[in-house]
Each structure stands twice: as structure tokens, then as C-alpha cells.
């Protein structure tokens, strides 16, 4: 039932998609022609009534109604609602196909883990795959109308060979009111455990791999059941349907051609068939039809999933793989390129031009650089000290205005930040350098006359000062130098920016 046109668009050419417009099976014309004819018929009926049935007074009232509907019909968000809805439906549609219970991976694990050339080993492998196929049939007949019509009862499943009569008795004797598609998976596990006890499955690793692959298969069956149970919320579908139908109901009236003699705006042309309105109906209503067809791909539409084909294919291929192909290997022999240094498959005359194309090495392999740009640079001295980097960064960020120049607030706050981000002050660093440079027993140049401090060891943390009030800051003794010159500020200092931390401002006030 799937419409496949992949071969028709294998090569992009002039009018490539145009040929697809002539297809009927699975086309939008097949889905929409009834609605399109109904809309066109109603439109023509209203147009004929306006022209030949209504009186002059009634025509004036109808014209006002047409202008009103045409003005406010655009308030309905048809494109917005339809876009999200169709995206949701298409994503759900593809995920449902990915949840189809295919047995290919499971049959490969069975043929590689369940061993035995005798009849019992063959019976184990075939029965395991038959249980997997039975579980797929049970879930598909629960969600697909096409599969249900093929297997309407359990008797039909038994007659088709997916279940024996003894298994049917055990299946029907299970006291459960829920869907029992999972029962064959449990039979699969029990039979695999029995094969492990008999040594048909040689180790626990292979047994674990077999059960893990079965759980993947069973989870896909469960996902199909949940997709069938949990639909797209009904309110969403109702909103989209009402939006589309109400919009085109308003277009039936609002898109009517009025008498040009009345002088209405944008009504200078009098036609009978609304061409662009029909195109708009074709696109929007067709968009809704796409969602209507894809919302349940397990029906009998032209583009629904080929569930019966998948059942037949999986059953035949799985039985062939675990039975006739078990341990069936061709004789090992050297390949054609055994002695070749470079293995390269030949090309036909139609594809010989591909041999001339260079292999792709990466998008950067064609980039060329100048010789001076390829010289390595020394890393010495490229990184500035941390405190200087902080200062430069703040110099770029802080605004400069009245009272905030180099000698104003900015010049006072940056040294404070440097002192707060360092372990010692600048004066202490200078004194430490002087003390460190003094010889043993000599008086340091800093004049502190204290014991020399080893700068290699971290200073012990000072204990917090307890008391009702903290002592005032006492400046360190300064070495004799030139007298200080006090330079008054060029203006009043402005208020501190609100983004600066308050402790910095408080420390500045105490220092002032």
C-alpha cells in the first residue's frame, strides 16, 4: 500500500517533480477532490444567489457581510496551527515505523547462540523464531485493520502456523483481561533457559545477549501498543480542524466578487471562479489531509504501512536464517586482492569518471598560509601579571567623568582592588624585598630593624581581632624619602558606581 517513487527522483533534473504530479494513487487529488468540489459548489451557489436572487437592498447588506468576513478571516491563525500539528503528526508517524517489530537482529543472535545440528537443535531455533513472529502478529492484529482482517480470530492464527493447538490452550487458559501479545515472549525466555540448561547455549554471555535482543523486540511491540492507545490529544485535533473549516467558511462569503459599480476597495474585477481562493483551499485543506492520513498509518490508505508484507517477509526470512542457513558456510579461500598492496574494486564504463576524482581529505586540507604566519612564537612574556590584567580590565569598564579621572575615584579604587587581590601591600612587598637583600646580621634598608622574613614560606594567618571596635589603620613606617606633595582633586568626587562591592567603598572612606 506504500507509494514508492524513489527511483523517479534519483536524479535531479528539469521538471523532476513535475512528473510526480500526474500520479493518482496516493496523491492529494485522490484525497481532496470531494472537498474541493463541495467548496466550489457552495461558492458558486452563493455567487449566483447574490447576482440573480437578492434584491438591491439585500445586495447592499450582503456586500457589507462580504467585506466584514474578508477583513476578519485573516485573524484565524491557520498556518501557525497547521504547521505545528502536521510536524507533530509526521514525527509520530516515523517513530511508529521505527517501532515495527522486525526479527532480523533477533534471528542473527539465535543462529549464533543456539547450537546443534540435530533435529532438536533445529527445533529449538525454529520454535524460538516462531514465538517471536507470533508476538509480532498478535500486536499487529491489535493495531492494524489490515492485519486484523487477515487474522480476525486466534483460530486463523493457529491455521496460519504461528501457534499450535496446545499453545492455543495455554494462551486462552491464562486469566488476564489485558492484551496478551507478550505471552509468546515469555515462552521464548522459558525455551531459551531450557536450551541453556541442555548446553545448546554454551555460556551465560550468549544467553544474556539473546534475552537482551528479545527485550528490544518486545519493547517495540509495546511501543506499537502505546502508540495505538495514546493518540494525539483530541483537543489539538479539534482546534486544527475547527480553524481550517471556519477559515474557509468565512472565505465562502468574504471572497465573493462584488459589483464593481459600487466602488468597493479591491473589488474592481468581477469573476465567477475564485482561482487563488481555490489554490489556498487546496494547500490548507490538503495540509490537513496529510495529517489525517498519517495520524494512523496502520489503516488501509494508499500510504499506510505494509504490515501484512512485513509479517510474511519476517516469518520467511527468519525461518530460512535459523534452519537452512545454520552453520552453512562457503569454503574459505583467498580473495581476489590477496596479494595486492592496495585493494581497489573496478568501475564500469558508466562510472569510470569517478576514478578521476580525488578522495576527500578534510575541509581544511586546501587552506594555504603565508610563510611568516606558520612560524611558532615564543610564549615568554606574553601573559601579563594578574593584578595588571585586573587593572586594565577595570580601566576599560569604569566610566571617566567629573571627579573620576586618573586621580579621582578610579585612580583610588584600582590600587584598593590590587591590595585586596594580593597577599601583601605594595609597601610590604618593597620592604620584604629590602629585607631579603640585606646580608646576614646587617640592618635592612627598609629601617624596620626586625627579623628577616623568608619569602618562600607562607605567612601564618593572623588571628581575628576581638573587641568592641577595630583599631585604626596605622601606616607602615616609610623610609626617608622626598617630602610628599598634596595635589588637590580637580573636582568633587562623584558617588561610587552601584556595581562596585561595598567593602571597597568602605575601606576607601576609612583610608580617606
UniProtKB/Swiss-Prot annotation:
The gene is BEST2. This is Bestrophin-2. Residues 52-60, 256-274 are extracellular. It is a multi-pass membrane protein. One of its GO terms (biological process) is bicarbonate transport. The C-terminal auto-inhibitory segment (AS) modulates the open/closed conformation of the channel and determines paralog specificity among bestrophins. In a closed conformation, the C-terminal auto-inhibitory segment constricts the channel concentrically by wrapping around the channel periphery in an inter-protomer manner. Chloride channel activity is allosterically inhibited by GLUL/glutamine synthase (GS) which affects the gating at the aperture in the absence of intracellular glutamate. Inhibitory effect of GLUL is relieved upon increasing of intracellular level of L-glutamate. Belongs to the anion channel-forming bestrophin (TC 1.A.46) family. Calcium-sensitive chloride channel subfamily. The lineage of its organism: Eukaryota, Metazoa, Chordata, Craniata, Vertebrata. It comes from Bos taurus. Ca(2+) binds at residues 10, 293, 296, 301, 304. Residues 1-31, 83-238, 289-512 are cytoplasmic.
Amino acid at each position: 500500500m506504500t507509494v514508492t517513487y524513489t527511483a523517479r527522483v534519483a536524479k535531479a533534473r528539469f521538471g523532476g517533480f513535475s512528473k510526480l504530479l500526474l500520479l493518482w494513487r496516493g496523491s492529494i487529488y485522490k484525497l481532496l477532490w470531494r472537498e474541493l468540489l463541495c467548496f466550489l459548489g457552495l461558492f458558486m451557489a452563493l455567487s449566483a444567489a447574490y447576482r440573480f436572487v437578492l434584491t438591491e437592498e439585500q445586495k447592499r447588506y450582503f456586500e457589507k457581510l462580504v467585506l466584514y468576513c474578508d477583513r476578519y478571516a485573516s485573524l484565524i491563525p491557520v498556518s501557525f496551527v497547521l504547521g505545528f500539528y502536521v510536524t507533530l503528526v509526521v514525527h509520530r508517524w516515523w517513530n511508529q515505523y521505527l517501532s515495527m517489530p522486525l526479527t532480523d537482529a533477533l534471528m542473527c543472535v539465535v543462529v549464533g547462540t543456539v547450537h546443534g545440528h540435530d533435529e532438536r537443535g533445529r527445533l529449538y531455533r525454529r520454535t524460538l523464531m516462531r514465538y517471536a513472529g507470533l508476538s509480532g502478529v498478535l500486536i499487529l492484529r491489535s493495531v492494524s485493520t489490515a492485519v486484523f482482517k487477515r487474522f480476525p480470530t486466534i483460530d486463523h492464527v493457529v491455521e496460519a502456523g504461528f501457534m499450535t493447538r496446545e499453545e492455543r490452550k495455554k494462551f486462552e487458559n491464562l486469566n488476564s483481561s489485558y492484551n496478551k501479545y507478550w505471552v509468546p515472549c515469555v515462552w521464548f525466555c522459558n525455551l531459551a533457559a531450557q536450551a541453556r540448561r541442555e548446553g545448546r547455549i554454551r555460556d551465560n554471555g550468549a544467553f544474556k545477549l539473546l534475552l537482551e535482543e528479545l527485550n528490544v523486540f518486545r519493547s517495540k511491540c509495546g511501543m506499537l501498543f502505546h502508540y495505538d492507545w495514546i493518540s494525539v490529544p483530541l483537543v489539538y485535533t479539534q482546534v486544527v480542524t475547527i480553524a481550517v473549516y471556519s477559515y474557509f467558511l468565512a472565505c465562502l462569503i468574504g471572497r465573493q466578487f462584488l459589483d464593481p459599480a459600487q466602488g468597493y476597495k479591491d473589488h474592481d474585477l468581477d469573476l465567477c471562479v475564485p482561482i487563488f481562493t481555490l489554490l489556498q483551499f487546496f494547500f490548507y485543506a490538503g495540509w490537513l489531509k496529510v495529517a489525517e492520513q498519517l495520524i494512523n498509518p496502520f489503516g488501509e490508505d494508499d500510504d499506510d504501512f505494509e504490515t501484512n508484507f512485513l509479517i510474511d517477509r519476517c516469518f520467511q526470512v527468519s525461518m530460512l536464517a535459523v534452519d537452512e542457513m545454520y552453520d552453512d558456510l562457503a569454503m574459505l579461500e583467498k580473495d581476489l586482492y590477496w596479494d595486492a598492496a592496495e585493494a581497489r574494486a573496478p568501475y564500469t564504463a558508466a562510472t569510470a569518471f569517478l576514478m578521476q576524482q580525488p578522495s576527500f581529505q578534510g575541509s581544511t586540507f586546501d587552506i594555504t598560509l603565508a610563510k611568516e604566519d606558520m612560524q611558532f612564537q615564543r610564549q615568554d612574556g606574553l601573559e601579563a601579571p594578574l593584578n595588571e590584567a585586573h587593572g586594565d580590565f577595570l580601566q576599560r569598564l569604569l566610566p571617566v567623568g567629573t571627579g573620576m579621572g586618573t586621580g579621582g575615584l578610579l585612580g583610588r579604587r584600582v590600587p584598593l582592588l590590587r591590595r585586596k587581590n594580593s597577599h601583601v601591600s605594595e609597601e610590604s612587598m618593597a620592604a620584604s624585598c629590602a629585607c631579603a637583600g640585606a646580608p646576614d646580621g646587617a640592618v635592612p634598608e627598609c629601617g624596620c630593624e626586625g627579623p628577616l622574613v623568608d619569602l618562600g614560606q607562607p605567612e601564618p594567618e593572623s588571628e581575628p581581632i576581638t573587641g568592641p571596635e577595630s583599631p585604626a589603620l596605622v601606616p607602615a613606617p616609610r623610609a626617608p624619602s622626598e617630602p610628599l606633595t598634596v595635589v588637590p582633586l580637580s573636582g568633587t568626587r562623584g558617588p561610587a558606581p552601584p556595581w562596585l562591592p561595598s567593602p571597597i567603598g568602605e575601606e576607601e572612606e576609612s583610608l580617606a
